[in-house]
Swiss-Prot record:
Compartments reported by the entry: Mitochondrion
UniProt keyword Protein biosynthesis present: yes
Keywords: Elongation factor, Mitochondrion, Protein biosynthesis
Disulfide bonds: none
Magnesium recorded as keyword: no
Tree of life domain: Eukaryota
Any one GO biological process: mitochondrial translational elongation
InterPro entries, per database record: EF-Ts_dimer_sf, Transl_elong_EFTs/EF1B, Transl_elong_EFTs/EF1B_dimer, Transl_elong_Ts_CS
A Pfam entry, by short name: EF_TS
Any one of the GO CC terms: mitochondrion
Protein name: Elongation factor Ts, mitochondrial 1
Name of the gene: TSF1-1
Length: 290
């Protein structure tokens, strides 16, 4: 018996079966699923200014049962990693950019946990194969990436930091029914000195985690409200209830100012723009209309 030929025959049969099942369920509605996040490079890390490379993807199926399947979670993890890995830095005013569904579906699937499998199937082929195994429609709803190279040596006072957060996770702590990405900017004449401190790194991690919880836990729709108004959907107007520790009775905007001053990001001779600021955020819920 020729084992290699037998394996090729079996693979062909599995592919043909998956193609038939995918065609059969193509017209079904898929509004369940998970939102996945991945951060390949967070920006300020380990006392250095590095680039930012992250992604958020929503993968859908028909039932919550399949959404809780480990195979589904593994595929979402690989697709999210692929989006973050192949995305190019954006030449636009905004850092967070929608990622083309066509480009992503036609891209080779790149696994972070199983690199030996890289390039053996495209994203769309991997989705089709999962349909063949679970019998449900699997579809991509949306994806976004944030990719920015490190600031040059001519901009030593600027750095970025990306924070990812999910809620209602199952298998993977980077996946849930609600997901968010937030991008922070740090600006200071003393930036290199300040970020070299391990204490500062720990404090920044804590701040990012709290901001992620805040964006998800509150009905957050924007960063600032229009001048002269207060909006419960504006992040900076909300009480910073999701920060664990002193100061969480302040608004998020006031807290960020105090936080930057206490950690010497802002000095008396600094311009007003020095400190820490939320530049952009994205917040998704599974199945919502886009």
């Amino acid at each position: 018996m020729d084992v290699s030929k037998a394996l090729l025959w079996l693979e062909k049969q599995q592919t043909e079966s998956a193609v038939k099942k995918a065609a059969k369920v193509a017209d079904r509605t898929a509004n369940e699923g998970l939102i996945g996040t991945t951060v390949l490079s967070s920006g300020v890390a380990n006392g250095r200014r590095v680039g930012v490379r992250a992604a958020m993807v929503e993968l859908n199926c028909e039932t919550d049962f399949v959404a809780r399947n480990e195979l589904f979670a593994n595929l979402l993890e690989d697709i999210t990693h692929t989006a973050a890995f192949i995305s190019e830095p954006a030449n636009a005013e905004t850092f967070m950019q929608p990622f083309s569904m066509e480009t992503l579906q036609n891209a080779p699937l790149l696994s972070q946990t199983k690199p030996s499998q890289n390039g053996k199937a495209t994203v769309s082929e991997a989705m089709r194969d999962l349909t063949g195994r679970v019998g449900e429609k699997i579809s991509l709803r949306r994806a976004l990436t944030v990719v920015r190279d490190p600031f040059t040596s001519s901009q030593p006072d600027l750095a970025l930091r990306v924070a990812a957060r999910v809620h209602q996770s199952v298998f993977n702590p980077t996946q849930g029914r609600i997901g968010s990405l937030a991008l922070l900017a740090l600006k200071s004449k003393r930036l290199s000195e300040v970020i070299a401190s391990q204490t500062f790194q720990d404090d920044l991690d804590k701040l990012c985690q709290a901001l992620g919880r805040q964006v998800i836990g509150f009905p957050t729709t924007c960063i600032r409200s229009p001048s002269g108004t207060t909006d419960e959907g504006a992040l900076y107007d909300q009480p910073f209830s999701m920060f664990i520790g002193p100061g969480n009775d302040q608004s998020v905007g006031a807290f960020l100012q105090s936080w930057a001053q206490e950690r010497s990001l802002v000095n008396e001779d600094e311009e007003q723009s020095a400190g820490v600021e939320v530049l952009e955020f994205a917040k998704w819920s599974v199945g919502e209309v886009v």
